C-alpha cells in the first residue's frame, strides 16, 4: 500500500466520522458544529471531485476553518497520487484566524494524518501570498475561502492567478455574496475569465471556478473595463441578500 493510499483511507475515515458526529472538538473538548461554518459532506465531496477531475497534485487554500474543505482537497490529492506519495507541502493552507475555534481545524489535520502533507501558514493571506510568489511557488489549483470582504478577496484572487499554473483552476466559495460577485465581475470583464457555474440545486452550488487566464501581463498599461456583479453571466445569483440571512447549504 502506497503512502498516498494509506493517507487517503485515514482522511476519508476522519471525514466520515466527523460528519456523522456533526461537530469537531478542540483539545479542551469543546464542540464546534460543522454547520454553518464548514462544508457539508456533499459540498466537500463536490470540491474533492473537482480537484480529482483537474488531476491537481499541489494545491493552495485560503481559509482553514474547521478543516473540512482541506480534508476534501487532501483526499483528492491522495487519489491523484495513488501510485506514489505526497510531498510534505502537497497542500498549503493559509489562515491566521484559528483562535475562534481554539485551533480545532489544525487538530482535524493532525487527527486525520493530513498534517503530514500540509504546510499551514498562520498569517493573513495578504502577507503570506506575496511571500509564496517571491519564492517562485507554483500550484495546480487554488481554493479561495478566506476573508469575504471585497478588497481581501480581490487580493487573494490577484495573487492566486500568479501562483496557479496557466489554465489551472481557481475556485471561490460563497459566490452568492455581493463582494464575491463583484470580484467575479472584474475577473470576467478585465481578465477575460470564463466562469464555470454549477447546478444551483447540486452539491457544488456554493462554488464558482475559472481556469486561470493569467500568463505574462499583456494588457495595455492603462487597460480598464467597467465592471459590476451585473456583468456576470445568467445564473440564479443571490443578489440583494440581506445581512444575517442564512448561508445556502
Model-predicted segments: where are they?
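S-adenosylmethionine/decaboxylated-SAM
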Residues: 30-249
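Mobile, glycine- and charge-enriched loop segments
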Residues: 1-45, 141
